[in-house]
Amino acid sequence: MLKNDYKKEVENSLDLIYEEVDKRIADKEDDEAKEIVNKGLKSLVGLDIGTIEVFSFHSISEIIDRENQYNSMKYLAFGCLMSLMGKIYSKKSEDTSYVIYYEKALDGFYKAFSEDEEINEKYTEDAVDTCKELSKYELSIEIDKKILRLYEMLNKLDKAEDTLFYMLQKTDNDGSIILEGMKFYNRLKKKEKEVLSEGNLPFEEVEDGIAELERRMGI
């Protein structure tokens, strides 16, 4: 199957799954919604939810990469479906155990967008929504770093910067995070000014960010 045909097939399948899951959630049919997601995982990713819940993302990634064809779309489907699973569980969960699904969704979106720059823009908001959901919780600094990089890939540069300064506040201006921030701004300085403006972080604000990091370093 040609790549564009495969992409369209995955997109159409995801559209139908989103529509059906949203309907089931609205009707409070959570078990049916979970089964729809599980069938989607088997069809689009080749794994069921039981396997995904047990395996680390590293192991899942190794399985997906074995076929070495159209992997970015499999990662995209994984991200979308894990985000849906988080949404289903969050509606009735009394704790935050469902956050693990959003963490897996983040991993999926990160891999998808890092491997394929031509993913349909309509999935950008799905990835952004996952980042926003995770930002509600106190998570590891490694997850924060991944959120920053995903925002950067999606050209949501203002959100990436917000994440950076959240990390600085969280770590009391840890030197390694300041260095991470300097690398972030230096990458942005290489972008066209129009791209920076589209990302809601104009060149002047990039320079302001560098100056602020230098101030925190005592330079």
Where are these regions (language model features)?
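Extended alpha-helical scaffolding segments
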Residues: K145-E198
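Alpha-helical adaptor scaffolds
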Residues: D107-N155, Q169
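"A position-specific structural signal for the A-helix of alpha-solenoid helical repeats
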Residues: E19, A77-L84, D126-D129, E133, ...
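Short alpha-helical linear motifs
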Residues: F57-E62, Y123-A127, Y185-L188
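N-terminal alpha-helical interaction modules that lie
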Residues: M1-K92, V99-E115, K159-F165, T171, ...
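Structural signature of alpha-solenoid helical repeat junctions
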Residues: Y70-M73, A77, S97, Y101, ...
